[in-house]
Amino acid sequence: MAMTLLPRHGKTHLANIPYGYYTATVSLIFIILLIGARKLIPVRQRNRSKWAKWALSSARGGSPLLYLVVLFVALLVPFVHHYSLLGYVGLYLKRLGRLSYVLATLNLFLTLRPNFLLPGYVYLDLIPLHKWLSRSLCLLALVHGVGFLVKWALDSQVSFVAKAFYNIPNLAGLVVGALMAFMVLLSVRPVRRFSYRSFYLTHIIGAWVFVFLTAYHARPGVFVPYTLLNAGLFVFYILSKTVPARGVELVSKSTDDVNNCLTRIVLPRKAMPEHFAPGSHLRISPYRRVNPLYYMLPSHPYTVASMPEDKDVELIVREHASGFHLLTGLGYTIQNHYESVPRQCLQSATRIALVCGGSGLSYALPIFRHFASEEKADQVKYLRLIWLVRDKYDVNVLGNIRSLASSVAQFDIFVTRSVPPDDTVESGSKLSPAQQQSPITDDLEFELESFGDQLDQNGALITPEIPNLPSGLASSFHFGRKLDWMTDLAQFVEREDLGSTWLVACGPKGLNDAAKLYAQQNEINLASETYAL
């Protein structure tokens, strides 16, 4: 009697391997497109249609709406091929799983800090793309898992319990799917804002579990090359948090708990390298590198308010009761620093306006000082910093800022809660009366929520006291009104200098949206940073 050997797997067992390689190739082309778009597309789009401007600006800016549509069109067009969709449901469910795993390599690549392979991007540029690609991967993984659960439940020839729980590789996939669903839940904005630490911890654990447990779950295997590539990216992630890290203690901390104003924190100069760009960020962890929590819990980002030539590293922050506080006498770990301002702006701008709110001064001030330096004297034609603050006491953080020698630099401070009884101040600062609020800034979310006059118990206006400021730093104070973009920046834009005109904004989404609209209307360059989770 002859013995017949039957194949362990069906004829479609290896059918998804070529599609995995195709996805990897598309991912590589995707990275090349990101690099090429940033290098070849100019910052400003002129003499083009509305849609052409949007497409080019989105391509240069790494817009998730544009790039993810392009990516998934390229991936889904050949998704159903050779085998019918209804006849081979299991094959295409497996293909979804392989697609999500291969794209994880691209997603991890986008999170590298610093990413030397993506020149021209500052590290904040690609966060929206990473966020939406992560959600897409979770969705693909969930459809893959739920699809198989439904398939087994409807198939009378198989045991659902045996397939889902007794088959160990399938059980591993079930664990991954449950974790993906939990990650999606925690990524919803209200939940994420309620407990960012929980979101971050789950995010980190989920990434590692997804990479290594899926490698055990997947059939045919994905260890070579995908798991190896992902493991290599994890190694780089660990090295980037350990090799440049350095321990520090606070030099000093100046705060006013009574008035709840901005806090000035001074770190030793070694907290930053010898050379760094103005407006750079650093990330601080309360844990040492030997503590596992150093890698599992989020570090805290701060914008450096200092310049490389300063003797200390200064931070300007607004501390909240429930937030993270830097305290004197404790040790902290500086993980790394990252540039946040486009180099083209720092190198070639000739007309610069900086608009910031509250602690956003830490972003704008070093950029302002950079352009007010003697080295930029012949280059800069217009330089103005507009700082929007809630209370007059916030201005005290400027007490140790040295004077500026620039002949074109202007510093305007809008104090929104205190209105003087007249237009005179003994210090000689110029005061503007309250004016009609510009509708473009009506939705500011953080510092500017209160514009009421300060009144005493008899209803009289309280006269503001101007803190002492270094000479040459502030050119005017404005009490009790918002910024009117068109009026207060009336001398900013010159048609012959549009290519080298930069508007720099830092604050909540409302402020940055207003800045974006102003930049679009005037066809100038924009660099902005939003302070939000």
UniProtKB/Swiss-Prot annotation:
Q: Which Pfam families match?
A: FAD_binding_8, Ferric_reduct, NAD_binding_6
Q: Name one GO biological process term.
A: reductive iron assimilation
Key word Ribosomal protein present: no
Identify the keywords attached in UniProt to this record, alphabetized. Answer: Electron transport, FAD, Flavoprotein, Ion transport, Membrane, NADP, Oxidoreductase, Transmembrane, Transmembrane helix, Transport
- Cite the SUPFAM superfamilies for this sequence: Ferredoxin reductase-like, C-terminal NADP-linked domain
Topology in the lipid bilayer:
Multi-pass membrane protein
Gene Ontology cellular component terms for the protein in this record: plasma membrane
Domain FAD-binding FR-type: start-end pairs = 240-366
UniProt keyword annotation of Transmembrane helix present: yes
A GO MF label: ferric-chelate reductase activity
The record lists the membrane-crossing segments as 17-37, 61-81, 102-122, 136-156, 168-188, 198-218, 220-240
User: Cross-referenced Gene3D superfamilies, in alphabetical order?
Assistant: Nucleotide-binding domain of ferredoxin-NADP reductase (FNR) module
| Domain Ferric oxidoreductase: residue ranges | 96-213
Chief location: membrane
Name the Enzyme Commission number(s) assigned to this protein: 1.16.1.-
Top-level taxon of origin: Eukaryota
- Subcellular location field: Membrane
Give the record's family classification: Belongs to the ferric reductase (FRE) family. AIM14 subfamily.
Protein's job: Probable cell surface metalloreductase. May be involved in iron or copper homeostasis.
Mind telling me what this protein is named?
Probable metalloreductase AIM14
Q: Which organism is it from?
A: Lachancea thermotolerans (strain ATCC 56472 / CBS 6340 / NRRL Y-8284) (Yeast)
